[in-house]
Structures are given as structure tokens and as C-alpha cells.
Amino acid sequence: IIIGKTDSELLIATNYHVVDGADTLSVAFADGSAYEATVKGFDENEDLAVVSVATKDVSNDTMDAISVAKIGSSDDLKIGEQVVAIGNALGYGQSVTTGIVSAKNRKTDSSGQIESSDSTDNSSSINKGVNLIQTDAAINPGNSGGALLNMDGEVVGINSSKLASTE
């Protein structure tokens, strides 16, 4: 998710677990081009990272084809609202799926397990894990770090988890 652009770099938000332990990074764009990237910062607890790509390395065609994402507010999402998940499902290239918001403010514990909580209670301080937006949009391996968009095209979340089992 391109969140910033200066004369010298593109700033891209992704998940921390995507870049964790990487010695080198390569960012692939929708036009098929790929460029070396460096980690600018991260928050392991929130599973967020920002990487940068030097604009001097990026072709003019690629620069012309990209834009900085519009950031929305996940607080404004409503249960039942439609969302779009963008990613690179299974590493096959850009993918887009749609779904609805099933719940908000889901919590995970340190092992990544979903903790039971009241999905409408924003004030809970008992669960200190990451807040999650639950959606039925297909999120597959490779979608991590991709954008979750509202129907106005604004980023309201970053795809990061797939619950593989309900047991």
C-alpha cells in the first residue's frame, strides 16, 4: 500500500510479519516491475511495517501508473458494509476479492488466536492484542500487507490474517 511519495522515495505500508527477518526486500508493482526496498520502521506488536523504494530506481512508466493510497478510518466501518481486499494471493499476482464486514475490534492474543470479545465494544482494555476487522472477503497466503478498502476506495485496514479453522 503506497502511503507516501517524495522526490526520493515511495513509502509502502505492509505487515511486519512480511518483512520480519528479511535480509533483502523486493517490492513488486501491478505492472510486473520489481525494485529493491529497505525497511524504514516497524511495530511488531501491531504487525505493521513501512518500507521504502528509491524513486530513482523506479521506471517512469511505473511511477506514472501508481498513486498514493487514500487513507480512510476503520472506525467509520459498519457491520455489513462491503469491503474490497487487494493482495497477491498465493503469489500468482494481483488479486481482488470482495466481502462484507462481519465484525470489528476482534482481538488476537500473542499466539495469533482470536479472543472472544464484544465486537461493538471499543473500550475494552482487557484484550491488548491487535484489533482486527473480520470480513468474509477471501484472504489467502500472499494477501498479507495488501489493502482492505471501503467502497470509497479508501484504505481502512491491512490484510493480515486468515482463520483456517473454526474449531
Stretch-by-stretch model annotation:
Residues 1-167:
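Serine-dependent protease modules
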